[in-house]
Amino acid sequence: MVQRSKKYREAAEKIDRNNLYTANEAIALLKSMPEYKFDQTVEAVLRLNVDPRKADQLVRGSVNLPNGTGKTAKVLVFARGPKATEALEAGADIVGDDDLVQKVADGFLDFDSVVATPDMMGKVGRLGRVLGPRGLMPNPKTGTVTMDVTKAIKDIKGGKVDFRVDKNGNLSFLIGKMSFTEQALDENFKAVADEVKRLKPSTVKGRYVTKATITSTMNPGVPVDPAVVA
C-alpha cells in the first residue's frame, strides 16, 4: 500500500467524495490545499465514452489556452534548408533533419513539442513508436505538420496544448500552474472542455464524458461533474 504524505492526507480530507464539483469549485478547493515550495502544474482528466480503436472515435485536437500554460515549451522542429532557418528565427529550440530523426530514434527526448514540415514526415513517421505514446507525434490536425513553421512555433510557445484520448478512453490536458488565479485556470479548463465537446464523434451514443477530475502535481484529484463537458 502506498504511504501518502501528511500534506496529501490533509488535502484528501478536504474533498467530499460524494460530491461532484463544478470546475471552479474544484480549482478553488485545490488552491486551498497545503502549499509546496514549487509552482505545481494543474491538469484535468476526462474519461470519454469512446472506443479509440475506431478511427472515427479517436478524439484529438489542440487549443490555444486563453491564459497560457505557465511554462515555455521546448520546441523541436524537423525541417531542412530555408524552413530550418525560418524555424530557428521563429524561436525553435532544436532544429534538424535526418540526423535529428536518428538522434530521437536513439533516445533523445529533451523537448516538449514537435513540429515537422510535410517533406520530413516520410522520415519522422518512423518515430511513431517513440513519439506516439508520449503524444508528441506531429499531425496535420493539430497544426504540427505544416509549412508555416513560424505560426506553429508561435502557437506552441504562446500556450497551445495538444490533447489525445488514450487507449483506455482517458484524455488529459494541462490547464496551468497553481500560481494562476482561479479565474485563469477556470477559463483554460473551459477552453479545452469546449473543444473536446465540439469534437464529440457522431457515432457516440449516450453520455460522452463519464468522469472528470482536476488535479495538481502533489495533490489528489477533485471530482468534477462530467455534465460540464457532456
UniProtKB/Swiss-Prot annotation:
Coiled-coil stretches: none
Organism: Bifidobacterium adolescentis (strain ATCC 15703 / DSM 20083 / NCTC 11814 / E194a)
Listed InterPro entries: Ribosom_uL1_bac-type, Ribosomal_uL1, Ribosomal_uL1-like, Ribosomal_uL1/biogenesis, Ribosomal_uL1_3-a/b-sand, Ribosomal_uL1_CS
Signal peptide: none
Protein family (similarity comment): Belongs to the universal ribosomal protein uL1 family.
Keywords, comma-separated and alphabetical: Repressor, Ribonucleoprotein, Ribosomal protein, RNA-binding, rRNA-binding, Translation regulation, tRNA-binding
Chain's role: Binds directly to 23S rRNA. The L1 stalk is quite mobile in the ribosome, and is involved in E site tRNA release.
Superkingdom of origin organism: Bacteria
Pfam family, one: Ribosomal_L1
GO molecular function: rRNA binding; structural constituent of ribosome; tRNA binding
The protein's assembly and partners: Part of the 50S ribosomal subunit.
One biological process term in Gene Ontology: translation
SUPFAM superfamilies: Ribosomal protein L1
Name of the protein in its database record: Large ribosomal subunit protein uL1
GO cellular component: large ribosomal subunit
